A protein has these predicted regions:
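Short glycine-/small-residue motifs
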Residues: 41-44, 112-113
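A short acidic/small-residue loop/turn micro-motif
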Residues: 19, 49, 117-120
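Vicinal oxygen chelate
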Residues: 33-37, 54-158
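Core segments of cupin and vicinal oxygen chelate
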Residues: 1-41
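Histidine- and/or cysteine-centered catalytic micro-motif in compact active-site loops
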Residues: 16, 47-49, 71
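A short, polar/proline- and glycine-enriched secondary-structure boundary/capping micro-motif
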Residues: 53-57, 122-125
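Ligand-binding pocket scaffold of soluble enzyme catalytic domains
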Residues: 10-13, 74, 86
Length: 158
């Protein structure tokens, strides 16, 4: 209901399966697709047999979230208005290159709706020119913390 009724996306498909595609493993699940305005899809698996009991707890948005661009501030404000009308928590942050509206969906997944700032392309082009060096510097600065927290073997897989 949330993706259709609140966010206005079209339910494009709901496919129920009794085995894991490409394997002989028997498992019942559903793959649900919602079509976005640009023709792309956001899709979810519904696997109640294997979902952990804390599945619906909000996830840390810094760890993982889905960002979707909207075409205008008016569209962003319309989403915010719709959310406010059903008393759904949301907040807006001006990141300078985009303005973002953040929410958690009913599954606990953080969603971000963004609208580009007028100088978005200029800001992104400037950042692109130094992006590889920024990642290198960040990796060097945080490597020991990550090794301590996750273990060197875990990081070697990334």
């Amino acid at each position: 209901w949330f993706y259709e009724d609140v966010l206005g996306l079209k339910l494009a498909a709901a496919m129920a399966f009794d085995h894991l595609s490409g394997t002989d493993k028997r498992i019942e699940y559903m793959h649900i697709f919602f079509e976005m305005v640009d023709g792309n899809y956001i899709a979810f698996f519904d696997d109640p047999y294997n979902a952990p009991s804390n599945f619906f707890v909000d996830m840390n948005g810094f760890d993982s979230h889905v960002a979707v661009e909207v075409e205008s501030m008016e569209h962003l404000k319309a989403i915010e208005s719709k959310l406010n009308s059903i008393h759904w928590d949301s907040f807006i942050i001006d990141h300078e290159f985009v303005t973002s509206l953040y929410i958690f969906d009913p599954n606990g997944i953080q969603l971000e709706f963004t609208c580009r700032a007028l100088d978005h392309d200029k800001i992104m082009a400037e950042d692109a020119s130094k992006a590889h060096q920024e990642i290198k510097d960040w990796t060097e600065r945080t490597r020991s913390l990550k090794e301590e927290k996750f273990g060197e073997n875990s990081l070697a897989k990334k």
